[in-house]
């Protein structure tokens, strides 16, 4: 299994949309900047057919240091969550089962 990187996405856009490297990079960077800014502004990001990103608050809780086993307090924090959309999930499942 390999990894898809931003560079791979830029390369794909260059090949399929006939963009220059700079145009592809600008498109990819702007997409991720917009996604980040929307989450920072407290907006949920819904990408139809793909999934939803949102910020969730996690309460503080007791935890444990995995190396020492010593109890530690895990502080409250805000995390980004992603929930796949049904259409995207089905596409991935179909392709995985076809292999």
UniProtKB/Swiss-Prot annotation:
Gene3D superfamilies: IHF-like DNA-binding proteins (4.10.520.10)
InterPro entries: Hist_DNA-bd (IPR000119), Histone-like_DNA-bd_CS (IPR020816), IHF-like_DNA-bd_dom_sf (IPR010992), IHF_alpha (IPR005684)
Alphabetical UniProt keywords: DNA recombination, DNA-binding, Transcription, Transcription regulation, Translation regulation
Keyword hit for Transcription: yes
Matching Pfam families: Bac_DNA_binding (PF00216)
Domain of life of the organism encoding this protein: Bacteria
GO cellular component terms given for this protein: cytosol
One example GO MF annotation: structural constituent of chromatin
Biological processes, Gene Ontology terms: DNA recombination; positive regulation of metabolic process; regulation of DNA-templated transcription; regulation of translation
Subunit and partners: Heterodimer of an alpha and a beta chain.
Family note: Belongs to the bacterial histone-like protein family.
Function: This protein is one of the two subunits of integration host factor, a specific DNA-binding protein that functions in genetic recombination as well as in transcriptional and translational control.
The protein's name in its UniProt record: Integration host factor subunit alpha
